[in-house]
């Protein structure tokens, strides 16, 4: 968050909406109010400048609020109550994309910053959505962990579908 491109130690206090961060560059401390009680934190590099932006998803309204590191705020409606935010770079443009997993129907709704809307059916209502670049191609992949079986289901962007047994059922 301090513009040196290294990860900073940070916590968010939901009761007050304050982000507390310890700067990796100089050990300094920042306290910035951004968000409200009930929000879910969704940090990422939404503007592609290489610096993490503070961001929250407000499930009650389906709105995303992004405090851009270079200044300014982005507000975007995307999602609904009950959705789980799964922000990541799904289109490989080095910008975090707004995305939600909807447990009620197992759909992933992804708004790619260059690719637009993508909808993917992948998961069950009891699955835990997971993002990551599981095939190392620079594009985020969609995956779910199924607690009832301890199995990971991964739909990689270039490597295709695979499963992995890792975890306790």
Feature names for model-found ranges:
Residues 1-169:
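Trp/Gly-enriched beta-strand/coil motifs that build multi-repeat beta-propeller-like domains
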């Amino acid at each position: 968050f301090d513009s040196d491109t290294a990860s900073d130690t940070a916590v968010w206090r939901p009761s007050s909406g304050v982000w507390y961060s310890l700067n990796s560059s100089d050990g300094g401390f920042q306290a910035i109010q951004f968000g409200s009680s009930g929000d879910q934190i969704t940090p990422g590099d939404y503007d592609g400048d290489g610096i993490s932006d503070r961001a929250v998803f407000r499930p009650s309204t389906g709105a995303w609020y992004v405090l851009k590191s270079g200044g300014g705020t982005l507000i975007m409606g995307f999602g609904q109550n009950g959705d789980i935010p799964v922000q990541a770079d799904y289109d490989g443009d080095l910008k975090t994309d707004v995305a939600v997993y909807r447990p009620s129907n197992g759909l992933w709704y992804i708004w790619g910053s260059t690719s637009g809307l993508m909808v993917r059916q992948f998961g069950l209502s009891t699955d835990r959505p997971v993002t990551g670049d599981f095939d190392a191609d620079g594009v985020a992949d969609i995956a779910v962990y199924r607690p009832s079986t301890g199995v990971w289901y991964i739909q990689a962007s270039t490597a295709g579908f695979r499963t992995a047994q890792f975890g306790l059922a």
